[in-house]
Design a protein with these regions (language model features):
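N-terminal ligand-binding lobe of clamshell/alpha-beta domains
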Residues: 1-165
């Protein structure tokens, strides 16, 4: 992502390059560590929800999809031509993801999980591999995306471990 470059540019404009360079380097190092941990592991088919009514997701060009890839997940809708496609239940059932990531449409994690319980025929719902992420941490290209990425990586690792049992 272009977050490190943005940090460096803002620091340059503000005359604080030493601070922004350190922040950008720290960000890059944390991203590299997350990638290292997921490297070589089985990809987890993942559905990314950004809204539940109507059901909306993201394709592979969205930053949330990049985070899922970083964590060793595979966005089941990555190849769709629209950045934020509407999804019918049939398409979701066909994709049958092993993990569901989201949180943008829910007031709370409990509500997010409750809404998904209506779709018990989806593998991720059956296996309880539904992971809520604070939308402020994952839906914007800022350094805070690392907070969301860490949660997603933990969730996908849990789904991966469950799949090999």
């Amino acid at each position: 992502a272009g977050i490190p470059a943005l940090l460096r540019n803002v620091g340059l404009l503000a005359g604080k390059s030493n601070i922004s360079d350190a922040a950008a380097t720290k960000f890059e190092n944390e991203v590299q560590e997350l990638a290292r941990i997921a490297q070589g592991k089985t990809l987890v088919p993942t559905f990314i929800e950004i809204w539940h009514d109507p059901l909306l997701s993201v394709n592979g060009e969205h930053i949330m999809s990049e985070v899922v890839s970083l964590c060793g997940g595979k966005n089941v809708l990555a190849n769709l031509p629209i950045l934020t496609p509407g999804i019918g239940l049939e398409a979701l059932l066909e994709a049958n993801p092993s993990a569901i990531i989201g949180g943008g449409s829910a007031v709370s994690e409990a509500e997010f999980r409750r809404v998904w319980q209506r779709h018990r025929s989806v593998n991720a719902v059956q296996q309880r591999m539904i992971f809520y992420v604070n939308p402020d941490w994952i839906q914007r290209a800022t350094p805070r995306i690392l907070l969301g990425a860490k949660g997603i990586c933990e969730g996908l690792e849990k789904a991966r471990r469950y799949a090999v049992q």
